[in-house]
């Protein structure tokens, strides 16, 4: 059986266009449902029933606070990898630790499509209007496509 990689890329692109994230080893245990927009209209999380690991944290964030990170779609000419960090050197959250900035987001899914890399990534919501770079403050720039 041969897989048609072109069709697989079309599938991955459709998932990215639809903001349907997949969790991989590189990104597991780094996210809560709100970062993936699964709390919006309760499409992925029901806050009125169920019991699951982490439910208390997820519910507390829903009822008492607001998500500081959300899921966004980006594109770039540079190669992207799942688990890569997003940076915004001008942000208040970009705290210097030695010579390194704290990441402001993480890449969850990616695909190369029509000679560009497209990805779903979490990002601090107050940074969507700023220049976002990959892996460090001097890395390649990512452009936000939409933020639904």
Where does each model-flagged region fall?
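A short, contiguous structural element within a folded domain that forms the immediate neighborhood
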Residues: 24-49, 57-61
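A generic local secondary-structure boundary/capping motif
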Residues: 3-5, 47-49, 108-110
């Amino acid at each position: 059986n041969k897989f048609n990689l072109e069709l697989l890329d079309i599938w991955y692109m459709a998932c990215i266009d639809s903001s349907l994230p997949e969790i991989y080893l590189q990104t597991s245990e780094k996210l809560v449902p709100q970062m993936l927009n699964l709390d919006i209209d309760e499409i992925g999380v029901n806050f009125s029933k169920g019991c699951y690991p982490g439910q208390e944290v997820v519910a507390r964030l829903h009822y008492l606070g607001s998500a500081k990170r959300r899921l966004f779609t980006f594109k770039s000419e540079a190669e992207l990898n799942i688990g890569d960090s997003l940076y915004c050197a001008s942000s208040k959250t970009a705290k210097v630790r030695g010579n390194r900035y704290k990441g402001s987001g993480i890449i969850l899914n990616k695909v190369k499509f029509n000679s560009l890399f497209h990805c779903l990534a979490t990002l601090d919501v107050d940074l969507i209007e700023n220049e976002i770079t990959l892996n460090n403050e001097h890395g390649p720039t990512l452009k936000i496509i939409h933020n639904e």
